[in-house]
Design a protein with these regions (language model features):
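Vicinal oxygen chelate
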Residues: 4-6, 17-19, 31-39, 53, 63-66, 79, 91-141, ...
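Short, charged/polar surface micro-motifs in flexible loops or helix N-caps
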Residues: 68-72, 79-81, 106
Length: 153
């Protein structure tokens, strides 16, 4: 997409250099009842439901719902101190927890984001996510109130 206003060609070139985010991988929803939520997506919406996966490093049990163009990830607390437990304490009915984008190079993405003032949560080092690939989370206050997860593909 070329922008005609304010020197469109130069702006287009700059946007190409800065391009980092790939496709939307999934939207994650924290739920108070994992089995009921999965059944609702399967029965009511006819979606294909994956098996529950425990992710102890992240304090969650997840179920992926396959859609034609992306996925929904249902999140349920696993163990003491789960971030989903505290999310559900504030949002007892559940709700959107984060949006997940793919990136080609997680370390380059982190460097570019941090150079622009974005905050990486946790230690700042990638962890292995539910797909077996490195992931990072970005502070929601830096992204219009939305927690962002990035995964290297």
């Amino acid at each position: 997409m070329e922008l005609a206003l304010f020197g469109g060609a130069a702006l287009q070139d700059e946007k190409q250099e800065m391009k980092m985010i790939g496709r939307l991988n999934h939207v994650a929803i924290a739920v108070p009842d994992l089995q009921a939520a999965a059944a609702q997506y399967e029965t009511t919406l006819g979606a294909k439901i994956g098996p529950p996966q425990d992710e102890p490093d992240h304090g969650v049990t997840v179920v992926f719902i396959e859609l034609p163009n992306t996925k929904i990830e249902l999140l349920f607390p696993l163990g003491e101190g789960s971030p989903i437990e505290s999310f559900l304490a504030k949002n007892p009915s559940g709700g959107i927890h984060h949006i997940f984008y793919e990136v080609d190079d997680i370390l380059a993405a982190r460097a570019q984001l941090q150079s622009q003032g974005a905050r990486v949560l946790g230690s700042g080092e990638p962890k292995i996510g539910a797909h077996g690939k490195p992931v990072l989370f970005l502070h929601p206050k830096d992204f219009t109130g939305c927690l962002i997860e990035l995964e290297q593909v």
